[in-house]
């Protein structure tokens, strides 16, 4: 059967007139064909009516209408779907969730955001539906169409909105994955890639490996200039790039480390939402962590303890720090630490968080110039959130360090013995890592008195070279085979300059400068900087060129022979300070591998261990299209035995070589920002760089100190309860003081009046006594009288004051007793109410949990019964079909599809004939129903074609005599082989017949829908051989599937929705092409 016969047969089945002239030049007879009578298929299934005649007019009317007035919204909506094969196939599989999986939240599409799916350059690796569920974690799509409209599943709560399919906000019940070859879904997805891709990728990426020739050391700095525009970079191969989540986002300077992994979990922040998704790598199970405020998260980090692996740190846009304890088994989490965010301008906004090395219990948080160290085991009885005030934090079990000036960043050494800070003046301060956390301020040193053990600087200018860039980040790194972190990598603004500082030789030994074209900042470079200490690899991103660079130490290089092997970084630094002789530094970066990200702008990245393989180097990346992970063969990063390009490095004798600053050094010309720390930087002198901007933390230092006493954030919860009582007592004491003073003045005035009234009588008595007694006796008597009067006056005054105080104190005592009694009663009543409410809530939760467990048990029992019944039904149907074929009963054979029409050559009816419709209907078919012998013969030929690999002949044979048994034989041919070997016309005929096939069991229905989706996505609508039939065939296929959907299971109804979208998109594409 040639293509012209195939086209005529298809047009005859569709009741379309044949064309007068075929596209290949052969003549074709124009004819019309009558409607066929209902076949056995229609007799057995009355709900699937063969309405070709009525459908034909409907299709023609719809096609004409679409050609005259094409819709503006339809083609635009489906254009993105039809342009990406992989995206539609992924969405098609998303509907096939395994039994027992909870449906996710309904996802709404934003009109303002891009609707384009993943790049069609991404690899399509077919995996099982279970693994796809675990890989993509996508929510369920819309339900079965009702009256031509797609209805969303309103029974589920919406977790968040996104322009892409987002993960569900409910815990996914883990299905049975025992059939999968690997326990890790991501490993399955990676291993299913094209085996030819890695070899090609390695050949291409070999061009982007550079070797630096910089032997020896001296009084100079090895300097390398990298021009990304001219630098040879290679893109990641398809087999190296895989999606974790697809989320459209815009660049935000606040975004930092948006995704992080450990050996067990993946965590990433959802764009514009206060949500973090946590995924278990081994099972693919995931659930959501919610912020207790409406602010999105900008940084996440797992603790790196080898035992406690479920603690996740998160920071939001206000600087709030949260630590979650994740329980993936129960899909629950607990906040075990919370430091509140900034509430005013006086509060430091930025929070810089670091876990202790190899710990999930101890960590440090930097707020402006303060660094606070905590231990979670000592914070069990602390109420959260913790205020963002240093005064409040000092009351907690912690350790504080005042760096004197706002440190840009800090980092722990890999062995955890020291940590380093770097500020805007390029000062590197080395401190010992605290191991004790006193509970009160009097048990710990004053934060400003904690001194560093060493201070280094990268700015010791020589000659005309003046480096005015401000450092923004630093990381420790060690050479392969050593236990200490000998080197510091300092990064300047936008990663334009990278300096390698040797702590042992106390100077800069190597610099890299990126020579980018002047462009606006595309994204923050703070997060595009990472160190993999286990592989001694530095990862640096270059935002203007959207590329990443791997810096590696040479494999054959070890620590300098002049430097003994120290067991810790602390010992190395002490030995460095005690060494006055110059020490050569010969261990430098010797290999650079340059890679480039495609399209989506990179935001952050970090090394990970998603793949448990020593042969692959993995990183996770967040970009403007979502989250991905990349795996690079370690053989590419190993330059041994390979020819790589050479990159020029020069010996710069005028570069900043750096050095050590004496801890006892003081400079009178130091700037105010450095006076607080007790040190002066080389730049702070008159000839140094100008200080045009004050540090942000210093600008509000005075205001913070003056307002901290009155600020609400400076009080704890217990202090707030004591404020009303303090005010009452102070008011009472003030009134008491006024009353005592008033009584004292009154008594004093009375005594003066009494003395004045009796003064005359006293003088008369004294004169008589003095005249009658001797002089001495009179003086003695006068003294006795005076003392008696003084005693009497003092006793009278004391009694008056005592009585006044007694009355006032009794009033105060009674008032306090009444107030305290009322307060106790009110607190007791509130406590009783809260206790009863909590008891009722606990009882309700227990009832709900019990009911949920019962419903789950019932659901599992019903599910097992349904599966058993389905197995019985399938067994009976198979036996029934086998019996029908063996008995050779043509009248009841359901395998014959009601699409067998007489061939075009046997019809003598033409378009120009005047034969009436009744005469056409009276014509008998040229051939009778096919006998069972014909079906058996067709099955024999199909098996021979399949065995011989004749794909085209096999499909043509089945289209000539379609049957269910023949479809089972035909389904052994893979989709890709069928698409490669069959023409568009043959494929179109094939999907027409399988859409009318009378079989709705799960296996055959799944294969039918897969064939239709594949052919729909790959058919060329511009092929002139099918341009007259492609629209009716696709429309008829769509209507046939809708009529049969009544007997579909819920799973296949969801898959049908996605398939109908693909058909509608292709039909809209045809309409747009015809209108143009």
UniProtKB/Swiss-Prot annotation:
Q: Where are the WD repeats?
A: 292-334, 402-441
Q: Which SUPFAM superfamilies match?
A: WD40 repeat-like
Q: Name one GO molecular function term.
A: molecular adaptor activity
Spans of biased composition, class Basic and acidic residues? Answer: 695-706
Locate the Phosphothreonine modifications and list their residues: 674
In this chain, where does the modification Phosphoserine occur?
Answer: 671, 673, 1075
Low complexity: which segments have biased composition? Answer: 1-19, 53-69, 174-184
Which residue intervals make up region (Interaction with dcp2)?
Answer: 789-1076
Cell location:
Cytoplasm, P-body
Name the Gene3D superfamilies for this protein: YVTN repeat-like/Quinoprotein amine dehydrogenase (2.130.10.10)
Which stretches of sequence are listed as region Disordered? Answer: 1-82, 95-127, 139-204, 666-714, 892-934
Q: What biological-process terms (Gene Ontology) are attached?
A: deadenylation-independent decapping of nuclear-transcribed mRNA; P-body assembly
CC per GO annotation: cytoplasm; cytoplasmic stress granule; P-body
Which regions are flagged for Polar residues bias? Answer: 70-82, 153-173, 185-195, 669-688
> Which of UniProt's keywords are assigned here?
Cytoplasm, Phosphoprotein, Repeat, WD repeat
Keyword match Cytoplasm: yes
**Recorded family membership:** Belongs to the WD repeat EDC4 family.
The record's subunit annotation is: Interacts with dcp2; via C-terminus.
Q: What does this protein do?
A: Involved in P-body formation. Acts as a functional homolog of human EDC4, which plays a role in mRNA decapping in the process of mRNA degradation. Enhances the decapping activity of dcp2. Together with edc3, acts as a scaffolding protein sufficient for the phase transition of the components of the 5' to 3' mRNA degradation machinery to form P-bodies. Intermolecular interactions between the edc3 Sm domain and at least 10 helical leucine-rich motifs in dcp2 and pdc1 build the core of the interaction network of this spontaneous clustering process.
What protein name does the entry list? Enhancer of mRNA-decapping protein 4-like protein pdc1
Q: Which organism is it from?
A: Schizosaccharomyces pombe (strain 972 / ATCC 24843) (Fission yeast)
Q: Which gene encodes it?
A: pdc1
